[in-house]
Curated annotation (Swiss-Prot):
NAD(+) binds at residues 134, 178-179, 198, 203, 220, 239-240, 267-270, 279, 298-301. Pfam families: AlaDh_PNT_C, AlaDh_PNT_N. GO terms for biological process: L-alanine catabolic process. It comes from Mycobacterium tuberculosis (strain CDC 1551 / Oshkosh). Homohexamer. Trimer of dimers. One of its GO terms (cellular component) is extracellular region. This is Alanine dehydrogenase. Its cofactor is Mg(2+). It is found in: Secreted. GO terms for molecular function: alanine dehydrogenase activity; metal ion binding; nucleotide binding. It catalyses: L-alanine + NAD(+) + H2O = pyruvate + NH4(+) + NADH + H(+). Binds 1 Mg(2+) ion per subunit. The gene is ald.
Length: 371
């Protein structure tokens, strides 16, 4: 199979969808790998590195898209790429379709067979391709939150860990999944007072046991959430419903009662965001004001640390890439139910029930295209 990797086009997206190790394994198995020249530069992977591993360097994105049977990306296609989508091609990438009717329509209109990293799901409910980026985003959320709490950045002027005689920052994390756990872990390590809210008691129990009570846990009710948000210096939203739009848990009316200069970091922005006032931002302009608070809603947070996130992502994706390349999408999905969970579109049919519900688009059972 011919596998193509174009340069990422999203704002300040420095990751790349394959490493030289992945190229070497694909070519060892007899596959061709086409990589757009310069695709790895943001992750400090040179064209020479890719070429030495067996890749063929291609001058333009158009050529990669046109020639590849299996196209690997990190982030969803942007509007400028919609015209490159085509029938008969497999697209394997993060998609987050519930938050983008335009991208969904482009995939359906083109007939592309698309598989979303974020909805590949093992029988135990784990999300193996989303997890590494959730780890990165969670850890970054505490860091960028601490940075934007500085008065020079528009925040409250609070130091995360405080100093002797002065209290630390009050950090509230909504969601105790992979991203929320990692955000809480880093915030706790920085010396902040951390409270995590979730409706999953088992996750709260795990946090309590691991951190010996140093991280406070609360069952997430409207009452507890309101009280926690009002007193917080930093709120990190880390709520996930796999494949679906994130629920809006923090209203603008609640934000109006927060401390002036409080910071809200919305990790869930890829799925529409879990704060009512959230809208996607970029690294060029990462924040905006809502009432007297500061919202940070960068939709590709792990892109800022590509030397970490490219390798973390490709370590997880490569086993699935090899299955797709070796066997084709249909046979790979038949033999691997986790991969089949990621099926999103095929020949104009929408195969994700949650996306169909959120966007009001007809749903087709994935089993019907796997038969």
């Amino acid at each position: 199979m011919r596998v193509g990797i174009p340069t990422e086009t999203k704002n300040n997206e420095f990751r790349v969808a394959i490493t030289p190790a992945g190229v070497a394994e694909l070519t060892r198995r007899g596959h061709e790998v086409l990589i757009q020249a310069g695709a790895g530069e943001g992750s400090a992977i040179t064209d020479a590195d890719f070429k030495a591993a067996g890749a063929q360097l291609v001058g333009t994105a158009d050529q990669v898209w046109a020639d590849a049977d299996l196209l690997l990306k990190v982030k969803e296609p942007i509007a400028a790429e919609y015209g490159r989508l085509r029938h008969g091609q497999i697209l394997f990438t993060f998609l987050h379709l519930a938050a983008s009717r335009a991208c969904t329509d482009a995939l359906l209109d083109s007939g592309t067979t698309s598989i979303a990293y974020e909805t590949v799901q093992t029988p135990d409910g784990a999300l193996p391709l989303l997890a590494p980026m959730s780890e990165v985003a969670g850890r970054l959320a505490a860091q960028v939150g601490a940075y934007h709490l500085m008065r020079t950045q528009g925040g409250r002027g609070v130091l995360m860990g405080g100093v002797p005689g002065v209290e630390p920052a009050d950090v509230v994390v909504i969601g105790a999944g992979t991203a929320g756990y990692n955000a809480a872990r880093i915030a706790n390590g920085m010396g902040a007072t951390v409270t995590v809210l979730d409706i999953n008691i088992d996750k709260l129990r795990q946090l309590d046991a691991e951190f010996c009570g140093r991280i406070h846990t609360r069952y997430s009710s409207a009452y507890e959430l309101e009280g926690a948000v009002k007193r917080a210096d930093l709120v990190i939203g880390a709520v996930l419903v796999p494949g679906a739009k994130a629920p809006k848990l923090v209203s603008n009316s609640l934000v109006a009662h927060m401390k002036p200069g409080a910071v809200l970091v919305d990790i869930a922005i890829d799925q529409g965001g879990c704060f009512e006032g959230s809208r996607p931002t970029t690294y060029d302009h990462p924040t905006f004001a809502v009432h007297d608070t500061l919202f940070y809603c960068v939709a590709n947070m792990p892109a800022s640390v590509p030397k970490t996130s490219t390798y973390a992502l490709t370590n997880a994706t490569m086993p699935y890439v090899l299955e797709l390349a070796d066997h084709g999408w249909r046979a790979a999905c038949r033999s691997n139910p986790a991969l089949a969970k990621g099926l999103s579109t095929h020949e104009g049919a929408l195969l994700s029930e949650r996306v169909a519900t959120d966007l009001g688009v007809p749903f087709t059972e994935p089993a019907s295209v796997l038969a």
